[in-house]
Amino acid sequence: MSKNIPLISCSPFPASRKIYQQSPLFSDVRVPLREISLTDGSGEKPLNVYDTSGPYTDKEAIIDLTKGLPAIGSSWLSKRADTEPYPARSVKPEDNGLTSSPIPAFEKKRPILRAKSGKAITQMAYARAGIITAEMEYVAIRENEGLAIKDQQTVQSSPLGGEIPEIYTAEFVRNEIANGRAIIPQNINHPECEPMIIGRNFRVKINANIGNSAVTSSMAEEVDKMVWAIRWGADTVMDLSTGRNIHNIREWIIRNSPVPIGTVPLYQALEKVQGIAENLTWDIFRDTLIEQAEQGVDYFTIHAGLRLPFIPMTIDRITGIVSRGGSIMAKWCLHHHKESFLYENFDEICDIASTYDISLSLGDGLRPGSIADANDEAQFAELKTLGELTKTAWEKNVQVMIEGPGHVPMHKIKENMEQQLDLCHEAPFYTLGPLTTDIAPGYDHITSAIGAAMIGWFGTAMLCYVTPKEHLGLPDKNDVKTGVITYKIAAHAADLAKGLPRAQLRDNALSRARFDFRWHDQFNLSLDPETACAFHDETMPKDAHKLVHFCSMCGPKFCSMRISHDIRDAAALKKAKGEGMVAMAEKYQERGDIYVEAPQKKRVNS
C-alpha cells in the first residue's frame, strides 16, 4: 500500500501476486516474480512471469516515498568490504537550475560510497576474477522466471552467433559479463535497485524515458512517472529532466526506483552554463558526473564518439545531426575548433565510472534521423570510434553498452547489427527503435516497433521505447503506457524468434485460455489486462458474458473456435465409432466366421 500518497500507482495486477524465490547460494538474495493465477478447474498451474514493478504491486509492501525503497544491495556491498563511505560534494544552486526549488531535498541521508583505494569493484572486475556475485546470482534466477537450475544444459543458437542456454546459471552470467557481452548496471550508491542484466543472450530489455514537467506540482508526481513506466514493463528508466529542480527530482526518483536509472549528464551540464553549449568545460562536466554518481545513477550516456573530423560528413544529410547530445557537442567542437572534451578526457570518465560501478552507454550522436541517412559514412565512423572507446573502458573494468539508431529501413537493419558486433566487440547494443519509415507522425511507436522487433531478433540487447508523441510533443501518462507496452510486444517477439527459454509459455497459456473461452484468464495473461477487459466489455459488459463461448465479433453461430470445439467433439465420436468397428473386425478374425450363433431363447408354452 502507499502511505498517504494517492498519486503513486500501487495496485496489484488482477489475479496476480508477488512471490519471491530464495537463492540457494546467497541467503540475502530473494528474487521477485509475478505469479498469475488461472481459473479454478481449468487444470492450469499458476504462471510465473518476469516483473519490473518492484514493491509497488506487492499488496504487502508499505510505500513511503520519504523513506525510499529497502536497500536490498547494502548487505552485498558490506560483505565484499571493498567500498568506503566519504564526505559527498555539497549541493550547489546550479545543480537545481539556479532556482528556488518547490521540490524539497530528499531528507533521509545515507552514506555515499566509493571504491577503496586500489580496489576494483565493478561487476566486470569480479567476473574477470572468477567471482560470482550476489547480483549475478540474482539475475540468473530472474531470467529463469523461477525455473529450477539444472546441471546439464543445452544451448540454443540465435542469429549472428549468439548462444542462449536452456537454463541460466550464475556462472553463465559471470562469463558473459567477463567477456563484455552483458552488463549489470548498478551503481553502488543505488542499493534500492533490483539487479537486471542487459545482453543479447538474455531476454530483450526495454528502456522508458521520463522528464520533469514544465510546471511541477509535487515530487510524488515526478516519482509516479517512473513507477508508471515500470508497472507496464520498463526494465530501466532514463531521467532526461532539464531546467528546474533537476538534482532534487533525480534524488527522489533514484531513492524510490527498483530499476536502473540512466541519465545524459551533458544535459545538466548545459543547464549549468545557461544553455550555451560553447561555454561548456570539462571541469563543469566532470563535476556533474560526480554529482550524479554520488546520487546513484546507474548508467551514463556519453557522446564521446562524435569527433571533430566526423562533423563534415553530416553536411549532405537530409536531417543533419538529430541527437540532442550530438548537436551540443558538434556545436562546441566547431566553436572551439577542438576535439570533443568527452573524447579527450574519456580515460578520466572511465576512472569515475569504475569508482562507483557506473555503466557507460556510449551515445550515438551521429545516428540517422531519417531513413535516407541510414548507414551512412558519419554513422559508421562514429560506431568505429565507439568500439575503440569500448576497449579503453574495458581496460579499466568499466561495463559498456553501445547506443544505436534511429531511422533505418528494414533492409538495412541487419547490417547495423553486423557492424556493431564487429566494430564494438559484441558489447550490448541499445537502440532507439529503429523507425522503419518516416511517413507516420503520431504512429511512430508502431513504425519503430517493427524495426525494434527485427533488430532485437538479430541481437540488440535493449530497446529504447518510442511513444506516439515522438517528433510531435511531450508524452503524457497514456503515451508512456502505450510506448512501453508496444515495446514489450517487440521485445517479446524478438525473444520468441531467438528461442529464449520459457518465452512461449505465456503465449501457449493465453492460447489455451482463448480456445477454452476462459475470458478472465485471457485478460489476466495479457500485457495489459485493463485494456483487454475494457475492449471486451464495450459490447459484452455483463458478468454472464465472461462465461459464453463466443465474442461480439463472430457471435455464437460463426465463432471459429466454437466450431472447432464441435469439430473436435465430432472427430472424437467418429474415432470412438471407428474403434468400435475395429473391435468387431478383430473379433471376426479371431472366430474366422461371419456368422455368429444367436443365443438360444427358452420357449414358453402357451
Curated annotation (Swiss-Prot):
Binding site for substrate: N209, M238, Y267, H303, S323, R324, G325, D364, G365, L366, R367, E403, Y430
Binding positions for Zn(2+) per the UniProt entry: H407, H471
Cofactor: [4Fe-4S] cluster
GO function term, MF aspect, one: zinc ion binding
Pathway(s): Cofactor biosynthesis; thiamine diphosphate biosynthesis
Gene3D superfamilies: 6.10.250.620, Radical SAM ThiC family, central domain
SUBUNIT field: Homodimer.
PANTHER family: PHOSPHOMETHYLPYRIMIDINE SYNTHASE, CHLOROPLASTIC, THIAMINE BIOSYNTHESIS PROTEIN THIC
Role played: Catalyzes the synthesis of the hydroxymethylpyrimidine phosphate (HMP-P) moiety of thiamine from aminoimidazole ribotide (AIR) in a radical S-adenosyl-L-methionine (SAM)-dependent reaction.
Family per similarity comment: Belongs to the ThiC family.
Name of the protein in its database record: Phosphomethylpyrimidine synthase
Organism of origin: Bartonella tribocorum (strain CIP 105476 / IBS 506)
Gene: thiC
